[in-house]
Design a protein with these regions (language model features):
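A short, hydrophobic beta-strand element within the central beta-sheet of small alpha/beta folds
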Residues: 81-105
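C-terminal output/effector regions of signal-responsive regulators
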Residues: 141-219
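Short, flexible/disordered intra-domain loops and linkers
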Residues: 64-78
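Receiver (REC) domain switch/output surface
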Residues: 119-157
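As written
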Residues: 108-120
């Protein structure tokens, strides 16, 4: 069976850091394909690069505007802000911020579990139960599994909606799963509005129509 290679983007303004990260990830070279990028000047442009590249995970340095060797422009955001912005568009997507300034990065990041100290990739993993690159691959696998499970659960709910019907909780869950998959999969098309329409809303609409009808007769 052919091994699946995960595509990982690494963002840093220094070429030396690109080389260091590539050397580090060589330990699991059979499992990943790493592409190093310099940060774009604006966060919107950087996000568009991500959309075009379609990676399985993103690893970014926290400081993206510190060393001006390879880039000559100012980068208006840091790695934590970049990850926060991308995960607003793609909830739970595997993203990681590596830094020497862990306190600043943690205070900026919306999820402290995304922040890792650089020393972990410079000999600081001795004795660790799980190395950083293993955690990256693990998070990718978990994310993909969550998508598969969401698709399966959504299929069951759609079938049940056209059969015995859904409870209010299940109707909310159907909308939640649909939204998650729409943000997670480029190939996914959102469900038609009639499928997501709640029975409670339909009932409310019927009540309003009847009230309007009664008021019209009284008038």
């Amino acid at each position: 069976m052919k091994n699946i290679k995960y595509k990982i983007l690494f963002i840093d303004e220094e070429k030396d850091q690109h080389d260091n990260f590539l050397d580090y990830m060589d330990e699991i070279g059979d499992n990943v394909n790493v592409k190093c990028l310099y940060p774009e000047e604006s966060i919107d442009t950087m996000i568009q690069v991500f959309e075009d590249e379609r990676p399985d995970a993103i690893v970014t340095d926290y400081q993206l505007n510190e060393i001006k060797t390879e880039i000559q422009y100012n980068v208006s955001y840091n790695g934590a802000e970049l990850v926060n912005f991308y995960r607003e568009k793609h909830p739970n997507f595997p993203c990681f911020v590596i830094t020497s300034y862990d306190n600043d990065a943690i205070s900026t990041s919306k999820d402290v579990n995304l922040v890792y100290v650089k020393i972990l990739m410079n000999g600081g993993e001795e004795g660790a139960k799980a190395k950083f690159h293993d955690k990256v691959v693990e998070q990718i696998s978990k994310y993909k599994k969550s998508i598969d499970e969401a698709q399966s659960e959504l299929t069951v709910l759609i079938q049940k909606k056209y059969g015995e019907g859904l409870s209010l909780y299940e109707e909310d869950r159907l909308v939640e799963l649909d939204s998650f998959l729409e943000k997670s999969l480029d190939s996914y098309s959102s469900l038609p509005a009639d499928i997501k329409r709640s029975k409670s809303l339909e009932h409310l609409s019927e009540v309003i129509d009847k009230v309007d009808e009664i008021l019209a007769k009284l008038g």
